[in-house]
Amino acid sequence: MTNDAIPQGARPASRILLLDPRQRLLLLQAQRDDGYRFWVTPGGGLEPGETFEDAARRELREETGLESSLGPWVWTRRHAYSWNDQWCDQYERFFVVRTEDDVIRPKAPDGYVVGYRWWPLEDLRTSTEAFAPRRLTELIESIIRRQYPAHPFDCGI
């Protein structure tokens, strides 16, 4: 899905592909109640009246303490999942953000976040950790090289 429409019934959310000057990607380690851990990009749901861009800036500030201008919207993702016994159908837009600061100062971290890490591309390629979206390690290479898609595309679950 690459148009501006939010699928009916889906929770809209913004996600951030945050890159530092060394071209490392910031990921947050999330943990479910059952102990399963995986790595995700910063981001979260839109609040009433927010645009996707507003939510991306707010989530960046809350989850990292950083303020930065947004780059392009490059990916979308719709996925349904169970989180701690609750069903969620989520539609996400991913925005590129480049920062000069690699010091994270979370202001309002979500309770499920148990860690942060700046990931070099090579570490992403060789890791056996779980990432969301699953194709993150494949798709982030062109973003690091500033080769952005002409239109946002579905990055898969």
Per-segment meaning from a language model:
Residues 2-25, 71, 96:
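Conserved N-terminal beta-strand and adjoining loop/helix that marks the start
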Residues 34-37, 108-157:
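Nudix hydrolase/Nudix homology domain
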Residues 23-62:
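Conserved Nudix-box catalytic region and its N-terminal flanking loop in Nudix hydrolases
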